[in-house]
Curated annotation (Swiss-Prot):
This is Ribosomal RNA large subunit methyltransferase M. The lineage of its organism: Bacteria, Pseudomonadati, Pseudomonadota, Gammaproteobacteria, Alteromonadales. GO terms for cellular component: cytoplasm. It comes from Shewanella frigidimarina (strain NCIMB 400). The gene is rlmM. It holds the Pfam family RLMM_N. It is found in: Cytoplasm. It catalyses: cytidine(2498) in 23S rRNA + S-adenosyl-L-methionine = 2'-O-methylcytidine(2498) in 23S rRNA + S-adenosyl-L-homocysteine + H(+). GO terms for biological process: methylation; rRNA processing.
Length: 362
């Protein structure tokens, strides 16, 4: 297949396009971008007929900042007949065999969501047709490729596949999280999503466990602290503003009325550092670098507020700078960055510092 379909947030098509153009070029997969503002998706059309197949194998979705999900797709199926939508879609996927799941989706826009009821209605007969053709297994399997059919308008769809090990587990790449009634603010969902995006369930059990120490810089009123407390951690909440009284009643939070940029942890066994401050991204990045160089945390999740223009370029420069500075200081690390569903004009970074042997964070 020659088209790579990428889901993104509406309004961030240019950033997603700039990123895939650069990353595909690095993999020697030539092509060009097709996108429109506020469509919430990007098409990277490869010059090679098998270019998209190469990208879904070799380009890790987790390494892309602005793409929520991606799949290799054939040509746009336009003017699908009302009396038979299934036939042309099944025919376009004739090259696929024994896939494990079907997802009939739309981009994340209000206009496209109007097709959601139609997509749900189409899913059953389409699944039957794909099973009959052999493209889809009779029983779902999370180890086989996923068939995607994305309707971008009435009678218009891209159809293709993603690989289960290089794909978002979520429909349209969007996790469905519930806002807890006792959470101090909606920002709580950002950290909840971040833990799920950067750590597997098994990793969360060992690295987000009860008893770990955490620091929340810019904590007020406690949206991110809430997620740490919910996981059983002891939290140093740093902010000159007031914290949510219910959080303070848990006995797991100590409130430091201080400037997050000047705070130094009194204890040096901090495992998690989290930070969601409305500040220039370069300044936040410098703060994270300083904490890493001082050895004040093991893992960090922090947000970088984005400029109005050249957002991909800005993020790339900051991430490269963080990487260069940590490398210069001989710090071994792993870093990921994502524009999460619950992020707005910001991206979320996960930085994991590999500890020296024998260091305890309990």
């Amino acid at each position: 297949m020659k088209n790579l379909f990428l889901f993104c947030r509406s309004g961030y098509e240019k950033d997603c396009a700039a990123e895939i153009q650069q990353r595909a070029t690095e993999l020697n997969v030539g092509g060009f971008v097709k996108t429109n503002i506020n469509d919430a998706y990007v098409i990277y059309q490869c010059f090679d007929d098998n270019g998209a197949d190469t990208l879904v194998k070799e380009l890790a979705l987790s390494s892309l900042v602005f793409a929520r999900q991606m799949f290799a797709a054939g040509e746009l199926l336009s003017d699908l007949p009302e009396q038979d939508r299934v036939g042309p879609i099944v025919a376009s996927l004739a090259a696929l065999s024994k896939c494990g799941e079907l997802r009939v989706e739309t981009p994340d826009t209000n206009e496209a969501k109007e097709l959601s009821a139609f997509c749900r209605k189409l899913t059953v007969p389409l699944r039957q047709g794909l099973k009959k053709s052999g493209a889809l297994l009779n029983a779902e399997s999370d180890r086989r490729p996923i068939i995607h059919v994305c309707f971008i308008g009435p009678g218009k769809a891209y159809a293709g596949y993603s690989l289960s090990h290089n794909s978002s587990p979520h429909f349209m790449g969007i996790p469905r999280l519930r806002m807890a009634a006792d959470a101090p603010s909606r920002s709580s969902l950002k950290l909840d999503e971040a833990f799920g995006a950067f750590l597997t369930k098994e990793e969360q059990e060992t690295r987000c466990r009860s008893g770990l120490n955490a620091v929340d810089l810019g904590a007020c009123p406690g949206g991110w602290t809430y997620q740490l407390v919910r996981r059983g951690m002891m939290v140093a909440a740093v902010d000159n503003g007031p914290m949510d009284p219910k959080l303070m009643e848990t006995g797991q939070v100590k409130h430091y009325r201080a400037d997050g940029f000047r705070f130094e942890p009194p204890r040096k066994n901090v495992y998690w550092l989290v930070c969601d401050m409305v500040e220039k991204p370069a300044r936040v990045a410098e703060l994270m670098e300083a904490w890493a160089i001082n050895g004040w945390f093991k893992e960090a999740i922090f947000n970088l507020k984005l400029p109005m223009k050249s957002r991909y370029k800005e993020v790339s420069v900051i991430l490269e700078t963080i990487g260069a500075i940590l490398t210069e200081n001989e710090i071994d690390f792993k870093m990921q960055c994502k524009h999460l569903y619950h992020d707005r004009d910001e991206v979320t970074v996960h930085l994991w510092i590999f500890p020296e042997k024998g260091v305890s964070y309990a």
